[in-house]
Structures are given as C-alpha cells and as structure tokens.
C-alpha cells in the first residue's frame, strides 16, 4: 500500500499543480493552454504506458511470476528522472515531451496495480482487499496537493515540483521490497 500511496501522492499533486506550474514556468502562456499542456500530454503518455505495461506483464506472467511487481517498480522508478527534468526545463517542447514521458511511466505502473494485488491475495478476500488497498492509497494521495501547496509557498515552484521525486523513490523502494522480501511467500 505504501507504493500505491506514494504513486497517488505524486500523481494527485502533479495533476492539481501542473497547470499552475506551467503558468509560472511560462508566464506568457494562457490559462487554457496551461491546463491543456499540463494534463493532456500526461494522459496521452499514460494511455501508451498502460497498454505496454499490461501487455508486457501479461505475456511474461507464466515465466516470471513476480513480473507485475517488477513492472510496477520500473514504472514508478522511471517517473523519477522525468519529474526532475520537468521541474527544471525551460523549453516548452521539452516540457511537453517530459510530461508525456512522465505520463507513460505512470501508465506502466498503473497497468499492474490491481493485477499485482491479485497475485498475492486470497481470492475470497479480493473485494475487501481491493477496497482497502485503493482507499488507503487514496488517503495518502489526498495529502499530495496540500503538501505541494505548502512547498510552493515555502520554496520555488520548480523545487516543489522536484520534491515529488522523493515520493516516487519511496514508493519504488516499497514495491521493490515487497517483490524481493514478501512476494515468494505471499504469491497465490
């Protein structure tokens, strides 16, 4: 759940603050453009990430039982460099490309959220497990926009955007630990 909570923290904070970040990074940009560029490219990238991540993990599942956790780890870890590049880039085309790739990375992670959960939870507990897992992640994620607002007030917008990488690192490590230390004993 720590991985999902950190993922939601990062993505909720990004989606709420991306348009504001775009306006502050490119003052000549109109609000409509900032909202479009701040969110559309993210979701376009996520569409392709979900498609690729899901197909990859489904294809390799029989040979690599832990592949879904591994794909989640790679997806969330790939967010880190794109968050950092996005935070400090000064070119709109490069910003758009970075947001697209950040969305792709989150899509790779997203493609296996519940499939990975089903790999380790008894079928008779899947409904309650899914509900608790999702709610727990959302509760942690709900703090993302508020913390981002605090960081925007305390630091520069670029530094506050870069701080999201910390949560992506923590989430990635949580998923890696689950794969390495608990998956083999918990797998169904």
Locate the predicted segments by residue:
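Extracytoplasmic gate region of multi-pass secondary transporters
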Residues: 1-51, 106-110, 114
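Interfacial helix-cap and linker-helix signal at transmembrane-aqueous boundaries
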Residues: 22-23, 56-57, 61, 148-156
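C-terminal transmembrane helical hairpin of 12-TM major facilitator-type secondary transporters
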Residues: 65-113
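Multi-pass alpha-helical transporter architecture, strongest
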Residues: 82, 86-88, 163-188
């Amino acid at each position: 759940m720590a991985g999902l909570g950190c993922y939601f923290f990062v993505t909720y904070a990004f989606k709420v603050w991306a348009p504001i970040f775009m306006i502050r990074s490119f003052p000549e940009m109109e609000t409509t453009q900032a909202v479009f560029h701040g969110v559309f490219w993210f979701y376009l990238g996520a569409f392709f990430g979900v498609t690729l991540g899901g197909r990859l993990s489904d294809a390799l599942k029989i040979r690599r039982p832990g592949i879904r956790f591994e794909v989640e780890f790679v997806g969330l870890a790939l967010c880190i460099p794109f968050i950092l590049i996005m935070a400090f880039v000064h070119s709109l085309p490069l910003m758009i490309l970075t947001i697209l790739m950040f969305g792709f990375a989150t899509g790779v992670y997203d493609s296996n959220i519940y499939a990975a959960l089903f790999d380790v939870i008894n079928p008779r507990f899947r409904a309650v497990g899914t509900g608790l897992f999702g709610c727990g992640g959302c509760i942690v994620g709900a703090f993302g926009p508020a913390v981002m607002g605090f960081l925007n007030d305390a630091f520069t917008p670029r530094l506050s955007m870069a701080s999201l990488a910390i949560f992506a690192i923590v989430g990635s490590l949580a998923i890696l630990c689950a794969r390495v230390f608990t998956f083999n004993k918990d797998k169904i």
